[in-house]
Amino acid sequence: MTHITGTLYIISAPSGAGKTSLVKALMDAQQEPQHGAQAKIRVSVSHTTRAMRPGEVDGVNYNFVDRATFLSMIEHGDFLEQAEVFGNLYGTSQSHLQQTLDEGHDLILEIDWQGARQVRAQMPQARSIFILPPTQQALRQRLTNRGQDSDEIIEARMREAVSEMSHYSEYEYVVVNDDFAGALEDLKAIFRANRLTQQHQQEQYSELFQELLA
């Protein structure tokens, strides 16, 4: 039996661009009947020292750990990448990532540009996607509508967003989230197209290709 290895997808975006909502919608869409056995996307669950927000679940949204535990994991080489954002540490488990890919699942990493650079340096075959808002004004409005942060925090997030967006050119694909449904279709198209590359088709249909050319 042919062993099919999953593909790693790096998805980055400034806070408020809709990355989390788009990834959730992508995951929901693959549960639809017409996807059947093709449904094999997983989302990596990062470790973080950030405080848990209302509605979040440990082990589902993030693996929440204290700073001492996180630093110990760095010392033991447990992370493929790690970064500090707004004073909070985030990292991706190396062993979990490799196990998921070896099982044939595509894996989504939702990380910032710093983490993306670290991952691409070690796994250049990873696909990378950057999600942009239609305008800065729209981004600011989305952050304000969340109702989670003070004006001071929102200003800090906007400065961080501009810095994050300046790295969009380092990514293979760019999705502008102006219309959510359209952006979701663009995201789906990237995954569909990647599964049709010669390399992926060779893995899936190697016996067929041999038979056709016999």
Curated annotation (Swiss-Prot):
Subcellular location: Cytoplasm
Substrates-to-products reaction catalysed: GMP + ATP = GDP + ADP
UniProt cross-references to Gene3D superfamilies, sorted A to Z: Guanylate Kinase phosphate binding domain, P-loop containing nucleotide triphosphate hydrolases
GO molecular function: ATP binding; guanylate kinase activity
PROSITE patterns for the chain: GUANYLATE_KINASE_1, GUANYLATE_KINASE_2
SMART domains assigned to the protein according to its UniProt record, in alphabetical order: GuKc (SM00072)
Domain of life: Bacteria
Class of enzymatic activity (EC top level): transferase
Domain Guanylate kinase-like: 6-192
Amino-acid positions noted as binding ATP in the UniProt annotation, renumbered to this chain: 13-20
EC number(s) on file: 2.7.4.8
GO cellular component: cytosol
Keywords (A to Z) from UniProt: ATP-binding, Cytoplasm, Kinase, Nucleotide-binding, Transferase
Cross-referenced InterPro entries: GK/Ca_channel_bsu (IPR008145), Guanylate_kin-like_dom (IPR008144), Guanylate_kinase (IPR017665), Guanylate_kinase_CS (IPR020590), P-loop_NTPase (IPR027417)
Family under the similarity heading: Belongs to the guanylate kinase family.
Entry-linked PANTHER family: GUANYLATE KINASE, GUANYLATE KINASE-RELATED
HAMAP family attached to this UniProt entry: Guanylate_kinase
Function according to Swiss-Prot or TrEMBL: Essential for recycling GMP and indirectly, cGMP.
Protein name stated in the entry: Guanylate kinase
Source species: Pseudomonas syringae pv. syringae (strain B728a)
